[in-house]
Amino acid sequence: MTASDCRSIDQAFLAQQWPSRQATLERYLQEQSRGLRQVFVAEDSGQIAGYATLIPHAKAGPFKKNGYPEITDLNVFQNFQRQGIGAKLLQAAEEQAKTFSSVITIGVGLHS
């Protein structure tokens, strides 16, 4: 992910009537530069379609003590859903995780 991607992703959230995620995305960019997170960005025809992040060691939850990598914050924007983009993002994160672990986890949030 680049600084430009942060702005484009935030604009995509705003276009969907979601709150700004700029601060979170900038934190992801900083963590990526320090090797604490990897961000996978999907594009379609030059537009940001979605993204997923991979952290090398779960920071919370039942897998924290095992040090397993965790896929977090998977988003595919509405205009790009049902095209296999989410599956490709998951596959990219899984392939990267395979380079340093035989186990991978996924963190999910529950929203009402």
Mark where each language-model region is:
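Active-site rim helix/loop that mediates acceptor-substrate recognition in acyltransferases
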Residues: W18-V41
